[in-house]
Amino acid sequence: GMYTHEGSDP
């Protein structure tokens, strides 16, 4: 996505 979130949308 907008930012990297561990285990979620990049």
UniProtKB/Swiss-Prot annotation:
Coiled coil (residue ranges): none
GO molecular function: alanyl aminopeptidase activity; metallopeptidase activity
Keywords attached to this entry: Aminopeptidase, Hydrolase, Metalloprotease, Protease, Zinc
Cofactor note: Binds 1 zinc ion per subunit.
Hydrolase as UniProt keyword: yes
A Gene Ontology BP annotation from the UniProt entry: proteolysis
Cofactor(s), names only, from the UniProt record: Zn(2+)
E.C. numbers: 3.4.11.2
Catalytic activity: Release of an N-terminal amino acid, Xaa-|-Yaa- from a peptide, amide or arylamide. Xaa is preferably Ala, but may be most amino acids including Pro (slow action). When a terminal hydrophobic residue is followed by a prolyl residue, the two may be released as an intact Xaa-Pro dipeptide
Similarity comment: Belongs to the peptidase M1 family.
Name this protein carries in UniProt: Aminopeptidase N
Species name: Helicoverpa armigera
